[in-house]
Amino acid sequence: MGFGSFFRDLRIKKQITQKQIADVIKKKPMLVSNVENGKNGPFSDNDLKKIVSFLELSKDEERQLYKEAAKARGKLPQEMQAYIIKNDEAYYLLETLARNELGSESLSQIIQMVEEQILC
């Protein structure tokens, strides 16, 4: 599933029209249609922020939306790029993970440890 299909499913689940989305981001409904049909790439990060707020997405929905946009663009969201570039430790961590190609189970354990540290 690409960004457009994911977004369409999410929009329909929230019972929101393409026109409502277009109004929120101050664009034409045709753009929303083109994004959903894969004729255009994902919305800009600025537009995504407006959409996330308007749709009142859960954290999981928001995370998935940004992930699908990043996959479609072939690059990380701007704020993640800035964080990684600014923090050598974050860069090293990602470099180490990529080099060692850890499996899902190991990555899930690392995520759980990080979340536990943040919540403490």
Language model features: what each stretch is:
Residues 19-22, 51:
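Short alpha-helical "recognition helix" segments of helix-turn-helix
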Residues 26-42:
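Recognition helix of helix-turn-helix/homeodomain-like DNA-binding domains
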Residues 43-64:
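DNA major-groove recognition helix of helix-turn-helix/homeodomain DNA-binding modules
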Residues 70-120:
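Interfacial/linker helices and their anchor residues that mediate assembly or domain coupling
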